[in-house]
């Protein structure tokens, strides 16, 4: 296997909140910054060195959408290596969360917009493969429908 030169000498570890409300809608945010600029993802970001994982999760959710959440558990771990010249390597931990309030206040420096989206509308949103994979775990009936 040929050796690939990555931009950073370490793996970037990130945490993402899959926030599902009592109406079974998921909170999606349209990114205003790379990576995934312009695509719909769930709130999250990099874990700072020395920062506990769940503290990072709460911090990122508050920074991006102004919500407090209750963490329900780990959904999955996903690996992403950027296909472009940046050659970044990410390991992303996805946690299912329940919002303590649904009043979203998005941070325009990171998020162009935020929306509560019903599972039957998810196919209409442009999102990275990792996001679709995780949403298929949260809403397995959607994944079966998308496979047809």
PLM features: what roles do these ranges have?
Residues 19, 94-98, 118:
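Short, well-ordered beta-strand micro-motif
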Residues 106-137:
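NUDIX/MutT-family hydrolases
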Residues 1-16:
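Acidic, metal-coordinating catalytic segment for phosphate/diphosphate chemistry
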């Amino acid at each position: 296997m040929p050796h690939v030169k990555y931009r950073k000498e370490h793996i970037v570890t990130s945490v993402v909140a899959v926030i599902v409300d009592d109406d079974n809608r998921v909170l999606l945010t349209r990114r205003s910054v790379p990576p995934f600029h312009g695509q719909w993802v769930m709130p999250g970001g990099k874990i700072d060195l020395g920062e506990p994982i769940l503290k990072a999760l709460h911090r990122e959710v508050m920074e991006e959408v102004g919500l407090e959440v209750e963490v329900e558990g780990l959904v999955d771990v996903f690996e992403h290596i950027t296909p472009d010249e940046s050659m970044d390597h990410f390991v992303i931990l996805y946690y299912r969360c329940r919002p303590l309030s649904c009043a979203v206040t998005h941070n325009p420096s990171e998020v162009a917009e935020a929306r509560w989206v019903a599972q039957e509308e998810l196919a209409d949103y442009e999102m990275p493969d990792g996001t679709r994979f995780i949403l298929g775990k949260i809403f397995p009936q959607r994944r079966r429908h998308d496979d047809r």
